[in-house]
Swiss-Prot record:
Biological function: Catalyzes the reversible isomerization-deamination of glucosamine 6-phosphate (GlcN6P) to form fructose 6-phosphate (Fru6P) and ammonium ion.
InterPro entries registered for this protein in UniProt: Glc/Gal-6P_isomerase, GlcN6P_deaminase-like, Glucosamine6P_isomerase, Glucosamine6P_isomerase_CS, NagB/RpiA_transferase-like
Protein name per Swiss-Prot or TrEMBL: Glucosamine-6-phosphate deaminase
Alphabetical list of PROSITE patterns matching this protein: GLC_GALNAC_ISOMERASE (PS01161)
Biological source species: Mycoplasma mycoides subsp. mycoides SC (strain CCUG 32753 / NCTC 10114 / PG1)
Length: 244
């Protein structure tokens, strides 16, 4: 694991965008694994800026999103399909036919999503956030390390955390379709971002903890190419570290 500790959220986003842009420059037809939630938004803004300044092009990029709420209309403003359009896809030159999100067509056979990824020769760079309980994707505590794309039940803590995006907690879906932990581990490179004091415990377990299903993120310790970029608040439970 490579750990990069920076001063603030903006620096984290800039560094992440730099790594993603280098991946695309080195391999224009890169297969990217993309994430949603509040963490990657500033990274996507920076990538849009790079595209507008003609530093990079996404025209040959293929993307696979980690997850999507189950039984949510794709045009619902809280769907991850809508999120990706509004936060990235509408502002870059990516071919929308090359943008995949695990949707209703995969409910009956979720691992068909993994087969689609395999057909694209695998994910070159997987972008991840991390939940306060250590979930990655929607792989909650006690998820199998061998799991492929599947329909999952969301924990109360995740439903509560995601309720900030909805008018009420009752509107938050209780299930999602998510790439499994093995699906994520199959990526050639992984880039995980975290900011804020509320992510500090999960980051501590990710980096210092034992590999355990109680903290799904700890499986990443077994991957041979993981870069973790965090701000000093997310690093607050790690001792003897200084911001770069």
């Amino acid at each position: 694991m490579k750990l990069i500790v920076l001063e603030n959220e903006e620096q984290v986003a800039n560094k992440a965008a730099q790594i993603i842009s280098e991946q695309i420059k080195n391999k224009p037809n890169s297969v990217l694994g993309l994430a949603t939630g509040s963490t990657p938004i500033n990274t996507y803004k920076k990538l849009i800026q790079m595209y507008q300044e003609k530093q990079i092009s996404f025209k040959d990029v293929i993307s696979f999103n980690l997850d999507e709420y189950k039984d949510i209309d794709k045009n619902n403003k809280q769907s991850y399909y809508y999120f990706m359009k509004e936060q990235l896809f509408n502002y870059i030159d990516i071919n929308k036919n090359n943008c995949y999100i695990p949707n209703a067509s995969f409910y009956d056979n979720p691992i068909a999503y993994d087969e689609l990824i395999k057909k694209a020769n695998g994910i070159d760079l997987q972008l991840l956030g991390i939940g306060i309980n250590g979930h990655i994707g929607f792989n909650e505590p006690d998820s199998s390390f061998d799991s492929l794309t599947q329909i999952v039940d969301l924990t109360n803590s995740t439903i509560k955390a995601n309720s900030r995006f909805f008018d009420s907690i009752d509107q938050v879906p209780t299930q999602a379709i998510s790439m499994g932990l093995q699906s994520i581990m199959n990526a050639k490179k992984i880039l995980l971002l975290a900011t804020g004091i509320n992510k500090s415990e999960a980051i501590y377990h990710l980096i210092k903890g034992q590999i355990t299903k109680k903290w799904p993120c700890t499986i990443l310790q077994k991957h041979n190419d993981v870069t973790i970029i965090i701000d000093k608040n997310a690093a607050s439970k790690l001792t003897n570290l200084k911001a770069n």
